[in-house]
Each structure stands twice: as structure tokens, then as C-alpha cells.
Amino acid sequence: MEALRIYLWSLCLSLCLIIYGANSDPLEDKRALLEFLTIMQPTRSLNWNETSQVCNIWTGVTCNQDGSRIIAVRLPGVGLNGQIPPNTISRLSALRVLSLRSNLISGEFPKDFVELKDLAFLYLQDNNLSGPLPLDFSVWKNLTSVNLSNNGFNGTIPSSLSRLKRIQSLNLANNTLSGDIPDLSVLSSLQHIDLSNNYDLAGPIPDWLRRFPFSSYTGIDIIPPGGNYTLVTPPPPSEQTHQKPSKARFLGLSETVFLLIVIAVSIVVITALAFVLTVCYVRRKLRRGDGVISDNKLQKKGGMSPEKFVSRMEDVNNRLSFFEGCNYSFDLEDLLRASAEVLGKGTFGTTYKAVLEDATSVAVKRLKDVAAGKRDFEQQMEIIGGIKHENVVELKAYYYSKDEKLMVYDYFSRGSVASLLHGNRGENRIPLDWETRMKIAIGAAKGIARIHKENNGKLVHGNIKSSNIFLNSESNGCVSDLGLTAVMSPLAPPISRQAGYRAPEVTDTRKSSQLSDVYSFGVVLLELLTGKSPIHTTAGDEIIHLVRWVHSVVREEWTAEVFDIELLRYTNIEEEMVEMLQIAMSCVVKAADQRPKMSDLVRLIENVGNRRTSIEPEPELKPKSENGASETSTPSEI
């Protein structure tokens, strides 16, 4: 009895500690940042105060998983002014990322930064820092990326940089550094270096530096073999070794007459060219509206220049609008500089994976054919961004200008349900097991049900499909791309994949309803059960509509033929699959008023999952051999 009492007391104490830890702040780190903020006085307002929680609310601050320490501070372009006060930032001993770029910070490199032993990413570019660089960089053994460009640092480049075994990017451009360039050839991980426009750097250009682009060391004094200093400048256009005779003399004209003719012809050509460009521009405006750069100008990988991601910024005050509680702190310029990879092109635009300078990955959706004005667009974004639910992909920020509309989300590395179900059906494919498919179904149902409660129970997703459902770290389904039909131009009659998801009563995408969402969700359930796309073709090029096909197979009482062949290796799931099929079929009935509500579907699917028994894959049987061993039979696919 005494032992039981001690056990219960220990359990209560542990629970109290867990609850306290979940709601506690990294108090010492918090005090350090508040002191820093008080002295630096940023011109841009930050939501930092003593009463708010650091890890969940403070802009530009990221904590570790248990919320006990701050590991990243990102405050680019917030108007920080003056010298970094000692014993503030340096007290964040668990800090890994520090970005204070594009501010008005002055003074020398803070000596007490040596306390930041875990620092991996350091961005202090575009400030007014001066004085020598730290003598011993080896105290930051985890440094991966350093950018100190566009400051006033002087003195020599420390040779201790050669001991940064993990360094991948080093930018010291546009300072007043002097002396020889140290030997950094041992840095095998170094992928980018920029020492350009440090005009007092001297000595021969090392061989290891020549493997980098010429722009990495322009504007540096070098010593050629003759011993005289020469300024490294970009190579000029191809020069001719001898002077050619004047063209005027070939024509028998005086150079004055020839010059007048050239000027007259040039004026005519320029006038004609301007007329042609004006006509083309007007035609393009009539054909495309406001005119956004075409998608084929966007690279699938590589840096996104302003010309390739955002065509232009007409209003310099336009900037990314972040939602409260978002701990990201980057700006449009960061996105423009980020490396980008096209993840997919959907109904409402193209989605990119953008990797920022501190290795943070975000998903950026570039919308097309937005019909709403700025005010209506922003109101809809506020509704979408206000939804906080574990099964809804959270909108972190958005951007609106005349030519560009962007939405920023967290990046889900596991990809979409569509890619997991239909991508890579070859030998190396890792099939989705039944338990994961159930978690996807339950998660997506909860997410959509939460969406339907928003805006006084009137919000509609409008574009539910497997490519808009993602897997989180626990393999639960998370719904993305919600609420966009309200701001988009009406789509043409559906074709291809989109036709397979759209409810029969929907003729105008702007008039989608919650019951049409239910229909689309039912199609996703059928995808999970059959492994087939909503619109697919047979080997004979026959186009198959998934909903119609399932109806016909079930009507002929060949229900077993419906299910994905990859699910047949699991035992004890037949009853669950049949129940899920019945739920899916109730969602895709033609009469909208006969479909269940999403809240009811959550309960029905959870009931199926709660009755789950032990599910184990059956051992695979080898094909029948000559001695009579049996082989498994599988239903033929359409």
C-alpha cells in the first residue's frame, strides 16, 4: 500500500512537471532578448513583451522542441540601430541561427559572441559594422553559413577560417579587408565564397580560389609574376588586336555625312521598334489582363531572381504579411534570393519549395487568375490564416500586389497523398499500408470539418483533392489550399483530374458548397481504397471515371475487385475496407442533400478505426514452382 502511494505521488509530480514545462518560457533567454530590444529600439514594431510566450508568439524567434531554449533569432530589416549591447545575444547559449541583416547596426563584431558555441548560421550583412574580424573563428565549430558582406570590416582575413570543417558558404564581399588571402583549400565542404571588392586584399590569387566563379574575387589587388600590383577586374568584351578602317571611307563618304545618316536611320528604327512594342503590349494586356510573367520563365531549380518570381513591385511598401504566432521572420527579398523547386502546378497556381539562406524550407504558392481586389483578398487571407488546427496546413504569410499574389505555408517533406499513392509504381515503391491510409482519412476529415466551422459555419474548401492533402510527421492527413475559390476567377468546365473531384451540381467553382466538399472528400476516400486516380486510363486508352467505375463494380457484386492490390497482403482488414467503401459511396451520391456532413463523417471513420484489430501483412508466397508450390492470385486491374 505504501509503495502504491509513493508511485501515485511520483506520477502526480511528473505530470505537474510536464504541464509546467509545456507552459513555461525560456526565461533567461527571454530576459536577454528584451534587454537587447530595449537598447536597439527597432523602427519596425515587434510583438515582444514580458507577458507573451516567446516560443509561440514572438516574431523572429524559434525555440527547441521542448521550449526550453531559443535556437534561432531572425530580425532582418526591422530597423535595429546602434551597437549590439554586450551580454544580451551572447546569453542565448543554445542559439544556432542569428540573422540581423539589413539593419543599421554599428560598432565592432561583438566579442562576447564567442559564447554562442552552437552557432551554425550567421547573417550580419548590410549593416554598418566595422573593425577587425574575430581572430579565432574555430570557437564556432558548427558554422555552416557566414555572411558579413556590405559592412566596413577591416584588417586581415583570419586564417582560423580554415578550421571550420562544416562551412559551406562564406561571404566577406564589399568590406575593406587587407593583406593576403589565407589558405582555405582544406575546406572540402565550401560551396560558395565571395571576397570581391576588398580592394586592399593583395597577393596572388590562390589556386583553390580559382575553382570558384570569377565574381568571387573581382576588385582585389594581385601580384603577377612580374611583381607589379594589378587590380582584378572583369574581363572586357572581346577586344580586337588591330584597328579596322573606317566604314565611312569604304563607302566614299565623309565621316560627318556618314554620322548623320547613322543617326537618321537609328531614329527611324527606334520609332518603328517602339510602335511594334506598344502594339504587342496592348494585345497582351487585352489577352491576359494585368499581365503576369509566364510560368515557363520560372526555373525548376536554382535561384529565384525578381524577374523570375515576382515580375515587379509597383508599391515599395508592399511586403509579406505574417499572421500572429508565426515565428518566421523573412521578407520578400529572402524569397527572391531563395533556391526554388517546383513542387506542382494545380488548379489555382504553382507551388514552390523555397529554401532560405538559413536552410529553412517553406512552400510558396503563386496564385494565378485572382479576381478579388486587394481588400477582399486580404479579408479572405485573414479568415484562412486564422484557422489553427493540427489537420489544416497553416497559412503563415501572404503577399499581394497588382501582378503577384503569394501564399506561404510550412513545407511538408513527406509530400502529398497523390504523390504517395500514384507516384513511382515501380519496384522500389514503398506502398501505403492500411493504417497510414486510415490516419490520412481521419486527419483529412477532421481538417475539413474544422474548416466548415469557420466563418460562422459558412467556409468552404472548394478544391479538395489528394494533391492538397499532406502527411505530417505522424502520418496524419493535413488539408491545404482551402478557401481560394472565393477570390479566384471562375474556372472553365472541368477537365482531366479536376473533373474527377468536382461534384455534379458544381458548374461555377465560386459556388462550391460544403456538400460539394463532401463529394470531393468521398473521391479521395475512393483513391485511398482503390489506389486509382479519379480519372485514369486503361491499357487500351479507355478513360475511366473512378466514381462511375466503383458504382458499376459494386453493382455487379464484385466488391473485392475494387480494392487496391497493395492492400491484399494485409489480414483482418476486409471488414474495415468494406465499411470505408460504404462511407465513401455515401459521400459521392448525386443528390447533394443526401450526403453526410463532415462532422458525421469524422465520427463514422473514427468508429471504423477504433474497431481495428491486429493488422499484419501476409507473408508473400513465391510463384508456383515445378514441385507444385502455390502462388498468390490477384484481381486483374482495369
From Swiss-Prot:
Residues annotated with Phosphoserine modification: S339, S416, S419, S513
Topology of this chain in the membrane: Single-pass membrane protein
Major subcellular site: membrane
Post-translational modification Phosphothreonine, affected residues: T360, T436, T509
Sequence intervals crossing the membrane: 257-277
GO CC term (a single one): membrane
Domain notes: The protein kinase domain is predicted to be catalytically inactive.
Family: Belongs to the protein kinase superfamily.
LRR repeat ranges, renumbered to this chain: 94-117, 118-139, 142-165, 166-188, 189-198
Compositional bias per record (Basic and acidic residues), positions renumbered to this chain: 613-625
Segments forming domain Protein kinase: 337-608
Recorded superkingdom: Eukaryota
Keywords (A to Z) from UniProt: ATP-binding, Leucine-rich repeat, Membrane, Nucleotide-binding, Phosphoprotein, Receptor, Repeat, Signal, Transmembrane, Transmembrane helix
GO molecular function: ATP binding; protein kinase activity
SUPFAM superfamilies, sorted: L domain-like, Protein kinase-like (PK-like)
PANTHER family: OS01G0223600 PROTEIN, OS05G0588300 PROTEIN
Binding-site positions, ATP: L343, G344, K345, G346, T347, F348, G349, T350, T351, K365
InterPro entries: At_inactive_RLKs, Kinase-like_dom_sf, Leu-rich_rpt, LRR_dom_sf, LRR_N_plant-typ, Prot_kinase_dom, Protein_kinase_ATP_BS, Ser-Thr/Tyr_kinase_cat_dom
Record's subcellular location: Membrane
Sequence ranges of Polar residues compositional bias: 627-638
Source organism of the structure: Arabidopsis thaliana
Start and end residues of each stretch annotated as Disordered: 612-638
The protein's name in its UniProt record: Probable inactive receptor kinase At4g23740
Signal peptide range in chain numbering: 1-24
